[in-house]
């Protein structure tokens, strides 16, 4: 499996480079975030051996267990890794997230952000966070409406133990490629409007977490700086019951 994961990662990097060339982007400005949901520690280590340092987890407890196992098995490696929570976050899980994760992509409420800031240990650098934008207005998904983003951005950016870095979005996976790219472009434009506010003049938002295995190129065309790839890195995984 280690060879297959390495081959997959090399293929994804080639795809990123090809998409960037097509749309005039610098591939060094697009981070591969390997989504390691349901992947065992051995698979994570295979990805690390292939050069990946950033991992995305959907479930808090599963992610923390991997971090602790890696810290015990490979202490020299674990410190170089960045762990991103890309799944929903409930209030009763904020402390463990604040204590272990480096990034949270799914901020959509001031209350959650306040708890993360209060519970982030002062010996750790501020937790890097993204606002989740419900760009297509789906009632089936989390995230805030684009019209509410500036107010939430101002509130979150004032919290001392958080650093607001940008926006995350997941449009309807059933949308066609043209519509998907349009929706991602709306998220990029929204970040641009937020950055026009004087509050963000010194530290403008710089991160767009957009795109997965099925729509990576559309996201890159629209300005993604971070693509969340699971199946393309680790292969098809069993559905959790």
Where are these regions (language model features)?
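Gly/Pro- and small hydrophobic-enriched strand-loop and loop-to-helix capping segments
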Residues: 224-241
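Conserved alpha/beta-domain cores
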Residues: 1-214, 220-222, 234-236
């Amino acid at each position: 499996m280690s060879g297959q994961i390495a081959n997959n990662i090399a293929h994804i990097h080639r795809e990123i480079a090809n998409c960037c060339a097509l749309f005039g982007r610098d591939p060094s400005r697009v981070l591969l975030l390997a989504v390691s949901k349901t992947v065992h520690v051995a698979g994570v280590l295979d990805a690390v051996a292939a050069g990946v340092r950033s991992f995305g987890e959907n479930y808090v407890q599963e992610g923390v267990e991997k971090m602790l196992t890696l810290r015990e098995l490979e202490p020299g490696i674990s410190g170089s890794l960045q762990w991103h929570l890309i799944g929903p976050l409930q209030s009763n899980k904020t402390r463990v997230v604040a204590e272990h994760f480096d990034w949270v992509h799914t901020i959509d409420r001031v209350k959650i952000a306040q708890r993360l800031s209060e519970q982030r240990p002062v010996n750790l650098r501020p937790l890097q966070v993204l606002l989740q934008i419900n760009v297509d207005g789906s009632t089936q998904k989390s995230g805030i409406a684009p019209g509410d983003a500036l107010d939430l951005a101002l509130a979150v950016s004032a919290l001392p133990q958080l650093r607001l870095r940008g926006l995350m979005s997941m449009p309807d996976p059933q949308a066609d490629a043209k519509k998907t790219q349009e929706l991602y472009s709306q998220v990029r434009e929204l970040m641009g409007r937020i950055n026009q506010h004087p509050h963000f003049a010194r530290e403008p938002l710089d991160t767009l977490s957009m795109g997965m295995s099925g729509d990576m190129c559309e996201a890159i065309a629209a300005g993604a700086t971070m693509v969340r790839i699971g199946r393309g890195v680790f292969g098809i995984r069993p559905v959790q019951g």
